[in-house]
Structures are given as structure tokens and as C-alpha cells.
Amino acid sequence: MTLNRVVVTGYGLTSPIGNTPEEFWNNLHDGKIGIGPITKFDNSEIPVHNAGEIHDFPFDKYFVRKDKNRMDQYSLYAIYATLEALENAKLDMDTVDRDRTGVIVSSGIGGLQEMQDQIIRMHEKGIKRIQPMFIPKALSNMAAGNIALRIGARGVCKSITTACASSNDAIGEAFREIKFGYHDVILAGGAESTINEIGIGGFNALTALSTT
């Protein structure tokens, strides 16, 4: 069996210290700190007051307003990073075999903000008022699914959920898919958006977050 060489041809990201690889690297090199006071919710009742929020996410570059209604924030982050990676790689999807192009993008939790919002909505307005897109927005595999739909990839499409190792496992699985000839191209990585009451509150209850 001939094993294929596997290479990284492009990369993209959104983070508290940059939304392009160049910006991220320069800020990292210069010692810029992306951790700061939590602004997304009132955290006065818990001892955790700092987090790595993304304040300048360039939503308008790839999305329209209705995308917020059908995708959780973590999916938007994942799609943005993917499209940036394709641009970085100068990869035209019309030049690849879409049936041999896959997406393995993981999330440890998935659409946690949507889960929180809909649970509150249910308690305030009743079970019949849960919004139809709740499940598609909340599922942890929907970042991968939304990416595949956006770029037209028809190969493997999955999410590997292994807590904090989820993205690392996705990259390893992508390596295997290409190495052994199952696919030619894999978009691999991970995304998360859990800076909210239930996310920070939950990890605080676990005593897994710094209080300084």
C-alpha cells in the first residue's frame, strides 16, 4: 500500500488576538494579551471575571444577518476560519474532487449559547415556543455540516467530541483520511463559543477556571 504525503496548505482562525494568521502571530509575538474582563454577561455572582472574548469578529466579510438565525456563534467562527484557510491556501473548490473533499471540524460542546437561550425561552414562554432551529443550531457536528454546505464538500463530514482534545483529534483523523488515500483534501480544526452564563458558570462550579 502506498501512503500519501500529508501537508498543510492553508490555515485560518478567529481569536481574541487576531482574525488572520498574520495578525494573530504578530500579536502573539509582541506579547499582546487577549484575556480581559468578561463583557458578555453579568458575572458579579461568581469569582471568575476574565475570559478570552472575541470583540472584533468580522461577521460582514462572509455572512448576512439571517445566518445568525440559523447558526450558533461557534458555527460562524468555524465557517469564517475555513473560508480564510481556503483563501490562504489559494484553493479553488472547483479544481478539486468534491466527493474526495471532506470536513472534520470538532467542538467540545457545540451550540451552548443556543441551548441556554432556548431553555430560558421555554421556561418563560412554554415548551411550544422553542424555536424550530434550536436542535440544528445546538448540535456539536453542525459546524462541520455548515462548512460542508457552504463550500460544497461531499466527502466525510463529522465532528469528534473529546473535550479539550476535540480539535487535535480532528486534525489527526484528517491526517489519517489523506495518508491512507480515503480523501484528497480535508478541512480540519475546531470551534467553540462558551463564554456565557452556563458555560463560565459550569466550569466555575467545576473549579476549572482561574479567579485571578
Regions found by a protein language model. Give the residues of each.
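ACP-dependent fatty acid/polyketide chain-elongation machinery
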Residues: 1-67
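Acyl-thioester C-C bond-transforming condensing/cleaving domain
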Residues: 2-3, 16-19, 30-36, 87-99, ...
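Generic anion/oxyanion-binding catalytic loop in active/binding sites
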Residues: 13, 71, 160
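A glycine- and small-residue-enriched flexible loop/hinge segment at structural boundaries
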Residues: 40-91, 140-154
